[in-house]
């Protein structure tokens, strides 16, 4: 259900998991395994389909729910090394629970997957000239074109194997609220921060269960993202472009508080909904002094019309921080669907053009 909802609504599986209250009511081990399956299938969906489609007579006519069930069992065999007989049996029952008439198809296809999974994993089914790239693509669960670019970016072929960790759970880091009026009971138990406000890594399940995020005592943010936001925190007026739901807004405001900076912060995002979410979390955390504005950062003059009118001249800022739309490949472990929603044209053409336009617009406001 999590995977179907994520696929149908264009969401990330991790976000769907977080929103499911029922997931918190089941045993922790069951919950962790369910999350492992959901995120793993999301991360490797293209590879799983490549294997499955070899044994489906009419791949495009397979019902979405049936395909998703087949993906789950195939993921278990290919990446979790679940014995074939176990994965096949579970997969057939899963298909039967949602589409009884497709149980026979599932049984036949999954038995063929079990018989061929080892050859597929080692890429012995492809020409030797392509075997290395295909094997790495299947190992990493990534599109072939992306694997080729990763290989080209390393000095040695062995270096690319680091990306095999793409399928491992991403470490969780959090940033502590500097505006809190009293110590948070959970954060007080943690070891000293890596740098001011940043605790990493922390146990994901324990941290989420503590309620620290619900009470806005901290935000979840990758360590490197916190470093970037911290480096961009300066006194004076700041325009944050691409603020989203405000994770970096939160971090920058907290770091400014710790540094004793006097500043005014304007957070801009394309979507009204995200601006509202940003302000709601800041309010809950007791963080004041942030204004939000929604609009297209490629048309800053239009977006900042009210600011300019207030000043009687174009508004200028001491710092402009741009979190521009990007490939997202730096967060693949956290949002594993990204590689399969991305095209090579996005990386080489569309995204760079958008980023340059945003940069030019922002440069006129410094």
What are these language model-derived features?
Residues 1-366:
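S-adenosylmethionine
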């Amino acid at each position: 259900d999590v995977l179907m909802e994520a696929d149908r609504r264009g969401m990330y599986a991790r976000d769907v998991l977080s929103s499911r209250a029922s997931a918190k009511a089941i045993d922790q081990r069951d919950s962790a395994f369910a999350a492992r399956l959901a995120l793993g299938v999301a991360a490797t969906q293209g590879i799983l389909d490549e294997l499955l489609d070899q044994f489906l007579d009419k791949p495009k006519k397979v019902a979405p729910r049936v395909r998703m069930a087949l993906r789950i069992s195939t993921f278990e065999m290919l990446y979790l090394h679940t014995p074939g007989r176990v994965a096949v049996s579970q997969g057939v029952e899963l298909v039967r629970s949602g589409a009884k008439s497709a149980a026979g198809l599932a049984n036949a296809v999954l038995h063929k997957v079990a018989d061929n999974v080892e050859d597929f994993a080692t890429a012995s089914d492809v020409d030797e000239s392509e075997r290395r790239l295909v094997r790495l693509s299947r190992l990493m669960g990534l599109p072939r074109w992306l694997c080729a670019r990763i290989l080209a970016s390393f000095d040695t072929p062995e270096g690319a194997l680091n990306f095999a960790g793409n399928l491992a759970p991403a470490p969780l880091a959090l940033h502590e609220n500097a505006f809190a009026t009293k110590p948070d009971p959970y954060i007080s138990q943690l070891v000293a921060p890596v740098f001011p406000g940043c605790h990493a890594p922390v146990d994901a399940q324990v941290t989420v269960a503590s309620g620290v995020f619900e009470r806005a005592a901290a935000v979840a943010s990758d360590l490197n993202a916190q470093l970037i936001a911290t480096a961009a925190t300066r006194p004076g007026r700041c325009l944050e472009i691409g603020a989203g739901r405000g994770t970096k807004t939160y971090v920058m405001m907290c770091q400014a508080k710790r540094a004793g900076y006097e500043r005014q912060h304007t957070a801009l995002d394309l979507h009204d909904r995200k601006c509202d979410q940003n302000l709601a979390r800041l309010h809950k955390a007791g963080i004041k002094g942030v204004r939000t504005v929604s609009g297209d950062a490629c048309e800053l003059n239009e977006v900042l019309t009210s600011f300019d009118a207030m000043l009687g001249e174009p508004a200028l800022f001491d710092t402009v921080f741009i979190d521009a739309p990007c490939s997202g490949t730096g967060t693949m472990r956290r949002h594993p669907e990204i590689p399969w929603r991305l095209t090579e044209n996005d990386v080489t053409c569309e995204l760079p053009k958008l980023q340059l336009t945003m940069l030019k617009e922002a440069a006129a406001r410094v």
